[in-house]
Regions:
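A glycine-rich helix->loop->beta "capping" turn
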Residues: 9, 60-61, 81-93, 101, ...
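Rossmann-fold scaffold of SDR-type NAD(P)-dependent oxidoreductases
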Residues: 17, 88-96, 134
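Conserved glycine-rich cofactor-binding loop
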Residues: 20-21
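N-terminal Rossmann-fold NAD(P) dinucleotide-binding loop
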Residues: 24-25
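Conserved glycine-rich Rossmann-like NAD(P)H-binding loop of the short-chain dehydrogenase/reductase
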Residues: 34-50
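The beta1-alpha1 cofactor-binding region of Rossmann-like NAD(H)/NADP(H)-dependent oxidoreductases
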Residues: 66-77, 112-115
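Active-site Tyr-X3-Lys motif and surrounding loop/helix of classical short-chain dehydrogenase/reductase
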Residues: 80, 102-109
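Catalytic loop of short-chain dehydrogenase/reductase
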Residues: 97-105, 128-148
Length: 148
C-alpha cells in the first residue's frame, strides 16, 4: 500500500446510511463493484460488521461507522470519518424508520430531522460534482388507519 493509499488520497468514498441491510446494503454492493470505497452507517454495530464482511468477501473496500442519524453529533462524526478516508463523492441517504418502528416523535426524528442532519453535515464536505441522494419509502404516502 502506498502512502497515498494509506491516507485516502485519490480514494472515492460513497457513504450509505442504512447500509447494513436491504436497499442500503444492495446499494453498497453496487457502488463497491463500480469501484468506490463504501462507508456504511447504521445504528447496530453487529449488523454493520456482518455487512462489511459480506462486502469484503466480494473484494469491495468497505468501512463501518455506527451512526444514529437523529443525533447531530453522531452524523457530524460520520462526515468527519468519511472525509478522513478519501474524497466523499456520493452520499446515499437510505436510512429511515417505518411506522411500526416506534412512536410518531421517534419516527419524525429519524426520518425528517435525520435527513436535515445528513444534508447539514455532508454539504460542506462533499466533492465538487458529487451527489447526495435521499431515498424514501411508500410509508410517506400511507396514512395510519387511526387518522382516517
Amino acid at each position: 500500500m502506498t502512502a497515498m493509499e494509506k491516507n485516502g488520497a485519490g480514494r472515492k468514498i460513497c457513504v450509505i446510511t442504512g447500509g447494513s441491510s436491504g436497499i442500503g446494503f444492495a446499494t453498497a454492493m453496487r457502488m463497491g463493484k463500480k469501484g468506490d470505497a463504501v462507508v456504511l452507517a447504521a445504528r447496530t454495530p453487529s449488523k454493520l460488521e456482518q455487512a462489511i464482511a459480506a462486502l469484503k468477501a466480494e473484494d469491495i473496500e468497505a468501512f463501518a461507522c455506527p451512526c444514529d442519524i437523529s443525533n447531530w453529533a453522531s452524523v457530524k462524526a460520520l462526515a468527519r470519518y468519511a472525509q478522513s478516508l478519501g474524497e466523499v463523492t456520493a452520499v446515499m441517504h437510505i436510512a429511515g424508520m417505518s411506522p411500526h418502528m416506534g412512536d410518531a416523535e421517534k419516527i419524525m426524528r429519524g426520518n425528517a430531522l435525520g435527513t436535515v442532519h445528513i444534508h447539514d453535515a455532508f454539504y460542506p464536505v462533499i466533492a465538487d460534482g458529487g451527489c447526495l441522494i435521499d431515498t424514501s419509502s411508500m410509508s410517506a404516502y400511507l396514512a395510519p388507519s387511526r387518522i382516517m
